């Protein structure tokens, strides 16, 4: 090889290396699209490595780079191999993550899969978590929909709600007679798609609502129509220990439409001692406060502030301790990539111990499985 040819190749290699380094650096000013990109089900939005724009997080075994980061909430990291100058890598699971077993199949930590057409699942450190691909099946139909039922749609996986249109008028007339509504209240019922409460009617007719409904005048409604605000009580926490979810249904919104609200809840930490703190002669430890301020965690992100939450204790006589009074706090969370979001979190004020246990007594079964629970752990 002649010296001129060698110099030409050396210059070409140098220029290529400089070009790659230039592409790997972050821009001086961020230029992002006005609307955030729409990601596939189960794929979250994260900020790129430069902290500029929101992008769809790369999943297991997908190509990644500084501008296309992996989904850290699923324990994924961009693996560039042994090369220190590589610009692209492959999303791999962190080494400490455990695989999952689901339907006699093994999935790697961070791997996403679709067991059926209605769910998208992900293996996260030995536990399988799924999100529904048919959210309309989980939402509540309008109360103005008589005899609602889910029906299969030809060529589609998800079922849809249908109403008996022919019986709408008869159904509303029956409600009017039952509740003794006047003409204005009948119109209110139709417009709000809620069963209105007439004057002097008994709240026992609506046992699902724990508090007395209130009337809201909303200027956003046509002609200043009234909205009878109704909200159910919060459901029990989905977990007896560790982080769970509590839900309720309300129409307290500008549209006066029934929606489901959720909040994060933790009745007690899973590692909380059961009997060590009991005084002599005592059989229950009702309410315990965290000995020091802690940060709440959710989906790999931590609360911005520290809190000293109260937890429910345990009993040795077969009773169970559950929250008696709670309040809901809107909490700010920060992720490793700088992303921030808010979530409603349950804060326990007091607990009670009784024999009316919603699940086996925590004294002997501190961990329990929900109906149709898909979590399966491996050592």
UniProtKB/Swiss-Prot annotation:
Where is the secretion signal located?
1-24
Q: Where is this region: Heparin-binding?
A: 277-313
Does the entry annotate any disulfide bonds, and if so which pairs? Answer: 26-50, 30-52, 32-53, 39-56, 64-78, 70-91, 284-321, 301-335, 312-351, 315-353, 320-357
Can you give the residue ranges of the CTCK domain?
284-358
Q: List, alphabetically, the InterPro entries matched.
A: CCN, Cys_knot_C, Glyco_hormone_CN, Growth_fac_rcpt_cys_sf, IGFBP-like, IGFBP_CNN, Insulin_GF-bd_Cys-rich_CS, TSP1_CCN
| UniProt note on tissues of expression | Low in kidney, adrenal gland, testes, brain, and ovary, moderate in heart, uterus, and skeletal muscle, highest in lung.
Q: Ranges for the TSP type-1 domain?
A: 226-271
Does the keyword field hold Disulfide bond?
A: yes
Residues where Phosphoserine is found:
184
Query: What biological processes does GO assign it?
Result: apoptotic process; apoptotic process involved in heart morphogenesis; atrial septum morphogenesis; atrioventricular valve morphogenesis; cell adhesion; cell-cell adhesion; chemotaxis; chondroblast differentiation
Primary location recorded for the protein, binned into one broad class: secreted
User: A single GO CC term, please?
Assistant: extracellular region
| Localization terms from the record | Secreted
IGFBP N-terminal domain: residues covered = 25-94
PANTHER family in the record: CCN FAMILY MEMBER 1, CONNECTIVE TISSUE GROWTH FACTOR-RELATED
According to the record's subunit comment, the protein's assembly and interactions are: Interaction with integrins is heparin- and cell-type-dependent and promotes cell adhesion.
What is this protein called in UniProt?
Answer: CCN family member 1
Provide the organism lineage as a comma list. Answer: Eukaryota, Metazoa, Chordata, Craniata, Vertebrata
What gene name is listed for this protein?
Answer: Ccn1
């Amino acid at each position: 090889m002649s010296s001129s040819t060698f110099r030409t190749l050396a210059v070409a290699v140098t220029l290529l290396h400089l070009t790659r380094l230039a592409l790997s650096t972050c821009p001086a000013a961020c230029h992002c699209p006005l609307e955030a990109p729409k990601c596939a089900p189960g794929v979250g939005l994260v900020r790129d490595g430069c902290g500029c724009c929101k992008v769809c997080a790369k999943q297991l075994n997908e190509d990644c780079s500084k501008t296309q980061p992996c989904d850290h909430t699923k324990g994924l990291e961009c693996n560039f191999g042994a090369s220190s100058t590589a610009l692209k890598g492959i999303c791999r699971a962190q080494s400490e993550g455990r695989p999952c077993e689901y339907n006699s199949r093994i999935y790697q930590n961070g791997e996403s899969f679709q067991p059926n057409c209605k769910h998208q699942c992900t293996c996260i450190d030995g536990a399988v978590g799924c999100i529904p691909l048919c959210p309309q099946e989980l939402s509540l139909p309008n109360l103005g929909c008589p005899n609602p039922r889910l029906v299969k749609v030809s060529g589609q996986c998800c079922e849809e709600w249908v109403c008996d249109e022919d019986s709408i008028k008869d159904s509303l007339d029956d409600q009017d007679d039952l509740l003794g509504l006047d003409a204005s209240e009948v119109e209110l019922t139709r417009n709000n798609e809620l069963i209105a409460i007439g004057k002097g009617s008994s709240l026992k007719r609506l046992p699902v609502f724990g508090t007395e409904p209130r009337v809201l005048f909303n200027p956003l409604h046509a002609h200043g129509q009234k909205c009878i605000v109704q909200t159910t009580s919060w459901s029990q926490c989905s977990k007896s220990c560790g982080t769970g979810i509590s839900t309720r249904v309300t129409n307290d919104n500008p549209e006066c439409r029934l929606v489901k609200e959720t909040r994060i809840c933790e009745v007690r930490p899973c590692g909380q001692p059961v009997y060590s703190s009991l005084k002599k002669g005592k059989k229950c430890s009702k309410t315990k406060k965290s000995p020091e301020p802690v940060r709440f965690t959710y989906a790999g992100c931590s609360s911005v502030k520290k809190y000293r939450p109260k937890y429910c204790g345990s009993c040795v006589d077969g009773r169970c301790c559950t929250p008696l009074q709670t309040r809901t706090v809107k909490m700010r969370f920060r992720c490793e990539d700088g992303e921030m979001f808010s979530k409603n979190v349950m804060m326990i004020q007091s607990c009670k111990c009784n024999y009316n246990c919603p699940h086996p007594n925590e004294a002997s079964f501190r961990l329990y499985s929900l109906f149709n629970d898909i979590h399966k752990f491996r050592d």
